Amino acid sequence: MPEAPDRAIRTLDLFAGAGGLTTGLSLAPGLEVDAVCAVEFDLSAAATYTLNHGGRIEDGRVVGGSVYAGSIQDWLHEVEPVEVDLVVGGPPCQGFSTLGKQNVDDDRNFLWRRYAEAVKRSTPRYFVLENVPAFLTSPQWDVFQDELESGMLADYGIEVDILNAADYGAAQARKRVIVMGHHKDFPAPGLPTTTHEHQHRTLDEIFQDIPNTVDRVGLPEGTVTYGGVDRPGAFATRELHFGRFYTDLSLKRFASIPEKGNRFDLPDELLAPCWRKHRTGTADVMGRLHLDKPSVTIRTEFFKPEKGRYLHPTEDRAITHYEAALIQGFPENYQWVGTREEIARQIGNAVPIQLGTAIGRRLQKAFSGSLEIRDETQASRVA
């Protein structure tokens, strides 16, 4: 096991994305996070992570930080093991809804194995694994439990539940599996305590200071170099309040949808042919967000109203990247690198900041207790 840290908690962030989980953890009172290493395959997301966690722009290049910009498989093969106090990450588990059409042993469906391997070799006191609710009913979950019983994670116990980010202060009803793992030499941290279960934050709180009108289409100008490639950026969150070009038909549809409405409110002449044939189905498609409720889950294509309930509550447009980032809890000055689609993916894949902070509060208490236990154990051995 690594030595007890003097102050900062040495953290390894896997499948790190834009850094939402680490950012949330770092905002927990009393928990000082030292992100000693992050692993991220998407280079634009890696650049975003770098700029917000130890990196900087120097002569137009993103430099510094401690991000391995590549696959976790390559990282495990190329990099010497790093001992840390905490491992966090959300391994992508693809194909839950179509496993019958896929090889269930496809490595893409078992990237969490690489996560488990990283835990085994990094020997953290604690780990946090985030995933979609379907993880708990997948073959991957069964194998994960086998690893806990007698495999790579046999030295660890876990606590697990499906948590709603809205219960922890996010203005978003986003449900995710959270697995809190602890080495058996140290106490279980417990799952986060809800703070807003009976009083969810609403979109009105998020949107009240944002201009309703959008007078720009597309990203601002500017590029930075990362990985030897020029990429759009870096942009502060507040610079992401831009729209997109809509067809006249789309604008007519938006104008016909009332507050809290959706595609079922459209007159017949504005319905797409597929909607005429299918009068049932989800009410979220082409739906307006509700000002008096949390947002629905922000996904990676939130800028497309046909993908879900992503129309602005009152304006005839989809929500902007700026609005989506604020719903996810990102700070106004967070720095972003990438194309419109890449930044949307970074925003949509992130762990809501408030949920990360709630997890951090539990870990802070656990680390405080575990450090005391660790010190007493060392003292008795010395004696």
Task: Give short role names for the model-derived ranges.
Residues 2-123, 133-137, 141-146:
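Core alpha/beta nucleotide-donor-binding catalytic domains of modification enzymes
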Residues 3-4, 153, 332-337:
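Short, hydrophobic/aliphatic alpha-helical segments
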Residues 18, 141, 176, 349-353, ...:
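Short alpha-helical patches at coil-to-helix transitions and adjacent helical residues
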Residues 75-84, 96-278:
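Class I S-adenosyl-L-methionine
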Residues 91-94, 184-185, 303:
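Short glycine-rich anion-binding loops that position phosphate/pyrophosphate groups of nucleotides
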Residues 232-383:
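C-terminal target-recognition/interaction regions appended to catalytic cores
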